[in-house]
């Protein structure tokens, strides 16, 4: 038996592998990630709560394909051009500030006055009756401001988290530090999801924060929803400003060594080349290693998109209005955050003790097990109901889907993100910086958009199709892509080991 002092040191190493001298850098980085992930959790719930109850879960696939993917491509072009003219610090302020400005405009100007900007329901219904195959595009046009909010919310994840924050972290930490820092960073950051969920539940509960005279008739009107939305958006903007201040503090007062200050102009100096947009994309295409990282992201995005659509459709059946949907997503965020923090504690030890390969394989394994459980439950829901007697099958389906979503994303945030980011570290600064920009933004959304293409094509050709009617085809795609993901992880591991030597 170990002496108490050694035992507690071992426990500390497992739960908190950060050394005291590293806290000066770790604490602001962790707080910065907490703010960014708070916004991610809140925005994810807001976009779904606006879109699904008013337009249907099926329309999400069209959003991701026809709106989010082109937006990501445009942003990648702009980012590469900015990276050749400005240093990373200024790019960070410009990008995050632009997001925060839009969120304020949406909450205080666009959303409360949407009746002025959106066409009336009679016109939309007449257009849908005349052009049934364009039903979903007409619906997008009818709620164009919701579409804009959806795009900006999706880009927050791809741009601010995956590109800006992790690129900054990858430059600061080497491989050995990343094994210790990244899981704990994620653990602290995911507390932001719990806080976001709590904020959403508080403001969507109604009676506690809304004048009772507004309830119940006005609470689901744009005016009532705006009363709930505006304070949440104000908190989101405040969190974004805090993240920018922390970024400023890290650059100006903590990273005193000029080598550690990330400056995309230095890429040009070191390599004596200035990449154009086309050259940057070619660099990614011609690098098999970067291609494999992109395939990881594509597989995850496609698979989670295939499972999420049917699940959100079921939530709409149970919670058909914005406020109830919002409240459910807030509670979902709380459980997601708790699960993520728990997985982060486990994941940090798996990564340090079992290595990159096992850690990278656990996410697809977790997703395959929980995803298959969800599909089987939906396909055989009546048979399952007959076996277990009289209970709310719709509620049970939503709970199974929620468990699938929580466990899959928890393993993704704790292990997938950390192993993916570690895969970039052995690369040259040039490939890491500009290659990551293309892979993270385009790769992240291409995976979801590929799943969205399959679904949206069906919904366009067959306007009456629903997720229930195409579920068996989604299951087949799920199994094929899961097999490809596992094979790609094994291949990438061999190349990662070679580069680390």
Curated annotation (Swiss-Prot):
Q: Where in the cell is it found?
A: Cell membrane
Q: Which InterPro entries match?
A: ADP_ATP_car_bac_type (IPR004667)
Coiled coil ranges? none
Could you cite one Gene Ontology molecular function of this protein? Answer: ATP:ADP antiporter activity
- Mention any one GO cellular component term assigned to this protein in its UniProt record: plasma membrane
Biological function: Provides the rickettsial cell with host ATP in exchange for rickettsial ADP. This is an obligate exchange system. This energy acquiring activity is an important component of rickettsial parasitism.
Q: What protein name does the entry list?
A: ADP,ATP carrier protein 3
